[in-house]
Amino acid sequence: MDVANLASQLNATTILPEGVLVISLILVLLGDITFGRSSAKWTPYLAIASLAACLYLLYTQWDQANPIGFLGSFNADNLSIVFRAIIALSTLVTILMSVRYIEQSGSSIGEFMTVLLTATVGAMFLCGAEELVMIFISLETLSIASYLMTGYMKRDSRSNEAALKYLLIGAASSAVFLYGLSLLYGLSGGKTHLDDIALALTDTSKSLALVISLVFVIASVSFKIAAVPFHQWTPDVYEGSPTPVVAFLSVGSKAAGFALAIRLLTQAFPNLVEQWQFIFTALAILSMVLGNVVAIAQTSMKRMLAYSSIGQAGFVMIGLVIGTEAGYASMVFYLLIYLFMNLGAFTCVILFSLRTGTDEIGDYAGLYLKDPLLTLALSLCLLSLGGIPPLAGFFGKLYLFWAGWQAGAYGLVLLGLITSVVSIYYYIRVIKMMVVKEPQDMSEVIKNYPSIVWKPLGMRPLQVGLVLTLIATSLAGVLSNPLLTIVNSSVADVPRFKQATIPTSIDVAIQPDTPTIAPEL
């Protein structure tokens, strides 16, 4: 094989966005080693600049002629580009919200940025990986970096406990996933590329070993997306971990898990489509019900948002279960919307904890009287998570539920509507507590609420992150047509889709034979 032919097959430009992040994390690490704590003044901005460059490079890769790189191991198609952009955006907002948090804790910002960028690179590679070894290495890169970030506050016993729990359960999940991949490798006759595995398994009967491999793979993916009953780690890890880490895990890590689910399940298990859809139907039902019901009883904002994220994962799984192009498009769109409204909520929680040192829901009582802007911001994000119009979360759920209804998943859609109403209750409860008007109803924490100051290091990035997420949460739904065009284009090459993309304008369509009312979104 000559050099030119090898270079064309490697097609290294497909991973250029990840390459920029790798260079950035090396520079951040070297800066922290060389300059110590003084590097905190510029390392976050270097990381932000590299993420902005990464997003631009992803934009330039859209609809590229040859998206396959590294001898077929990596696919930079439009679907992977959208998921990688979601992860890069979540990391960018996480950095904006974390600078002041890490600075106030007394920890090293450079080390934190290095580990966070490492997790981002692993997650982005996972979105496009099409070879078993690359899938596993990418997943482990993301997982190990996540363990390190979870226990980053070394002097906090809760952070250490969360890291240990996450490590033990995550290690078991990785072992199960690896065993599932090994079965897939053996049954396919030693193939490692997903397309080759699918081709080798085309004539294979639904053997017990193949079903076991499917179950093991789904169990590991479910752990990554925090689906019930593989969610036990989520509340404890979310409560004990640094809040910026929780924000990244709730969006970036979850998006990578769903990207892996789409690519692995639709390509590597051609004979078991009905089986994995049935399993994910059960997971979606359990996640929507348990996540939203248990969230009602929580007294900590971080634990409430943890169970909320479990319920949100159940909603997203509706798009995965129905297996249509409209389902995948609505799933990707909802993840994009979820990024802004969830990170916006966590930004508000961080800002409140920086000023008060607590995240208990009861301590938010009367916040409106002392900090009306923070109250408004958190209220908008929570209402959007609940799906209240005209905020972005409403349109995300509308597209998702309509795709499910079109595909005939009436039970899942109705359950999703019911559990959405349940979620509104615990979101409204927090808002109601914040807007009490009587001074005697204020919590002791709010009575001693400090004056609002934006001058300390890291407060301006936090302010920028909050404004960005609020603008997106408020307008992304109303101005959704460009986003829908992007997500519809991104799923055009997804295998096994069964129906057309989501329409792009609201209309009443009446067919000559069968009258139907279909909102074209």
UniProtKB/Swiss-Prot annotation:
It is found in: Cellular thylakoid membrane. One of its GO terms (biological process) is photosynthesis, light reaction. Its main location: membrane. It is an enzyme of class 7 (translocase). The keyword Hydrolase does not apply. It is a multi-pass membrane protein. Its EC number is 7.1.1.-. It comes from the Bacteria. Keywords: Membrane, NAD, NADP, Plastoquinone, Quinone, Thylakoid, Translocase, Transmembrane, Transmembrane helix, Transport. It catalyses: a plastoquinone + NADH + (n+1) H(+)(in) = a plastoquinol + NAD(+) + n H(+)(out); a plastoquinone + NADPH + (n+1) H(+)(in) = a plastoquinol + NADP(+) + n H(+)(out). The chain crosses the membrane at residues 15-35, 42-62, 79-99, 109-126, 131-153, 167-187, 208-228, 242-262, 276-296, 304-324, 332-352, 376-396, 398-418, 464-484. Coiled coil: none annotated. Disulfide bonds: none annotated. One of its GO terms (cellular component) is plasma membrane-derived thylakoid membrane. GO terms for molecular function: NADH dehydrogenase (ubiquinone) activity; quinone binding. NDH-1 shuttles electrons from an unknown electron donor, via FMN and iron-sulfur (Fe-S) centers, to quinones in the respiratory and/or the photosynthetic chain. The immediate electron acceptor for the enzyme in this species is believed to be plastoquinone. Couples the redox reaction to proton translocation, and thus conserves the redox energy in a proton gradient. Cyanobacterial NDH-1 also plays a role in inorganic carbon-concentration. Belongs to the complex I subunit 2 family. PANTHER family: NADH DEHYDROGENASE. NDH-1 can be composed of about 15 different subunits; different subcomplexes with different compositions have been identified which probably have different functions. This is NAD(P)H-quinone oxidoreductase subunit 2. It comes from Acaryochloris marina (strain MBIC 11017). The lineage of its organism: Bacteria, Bacillati, Cyanobacteriota, Cyanophyceae, Acaryochloridales. The gene is ndhB.
